[in-house]
UniProtKB/Swiss-Prot annotation:
Disulfide-bond pairs as recorded: C26-C85
Higher taxonomy: Eukaryota, Metazoa, Chordata, Craniata, Vertebrata
Note: This chain was obtained from antibody to the specific carbohydrate of group C Streptococci and was isolated from the serum of a single rabbit.
SUPFAM superfamilies according to UniProt: Immunoglobulin (SSF48726)
The protein's name in its UniProt record: Ig kappa-b4 chain C region
Residues of the Ig-like domain: 5-95
Length: 103
């Protein structure tokens, strides 16, 4: 049976923004079958600066874990507000997002 992922998004730390390069991390845990990760910035789908890393299938429950990072310059990051990670599995999507400056 399909297992929906638990999705978490992690905004960059303020001291990372100061370095000039920002990474935003999206994690999808314990899912089956496979998923697709889409990044959106202010509603626009991103196609560059994305790196996905998937763990091998868990032998106990046959699920996967995936980590996806979106890398931007601090200038790019500061010029946008809403950052969204969308994890799609078949016809179902789990969406997590944050607004820059909320915390």
């Amino acid at each position: 049976d399909p297992v929906a992922p638990t999705v978490l998004i992690f905004p960059p730390a303020a001291d990372q923004v100061a370095t000039g390069t920002v990474t935003i991390v999206c994690v999808a845990n314990k899912y089956f079958p496979d998923v697709t990760v889409t990044w959106e910035v202010d509603g626009t789908t991103q196609t560059t600066g994305i790196e996905n890393s998937k763990t091998p299938q868990n032998s106990a429950d046959c699920t996967y874990n995936l980590s996806s990072t979106l890398t931007l310059t601090s200038t790019q990051y500061n010029s946008h507000k809403e950052y969204t990670c969308k994890v799609t599995q078949g016809t179902t999507s789990v969406v997590q997002s944050f607004n820059r400056g909320d915390c």
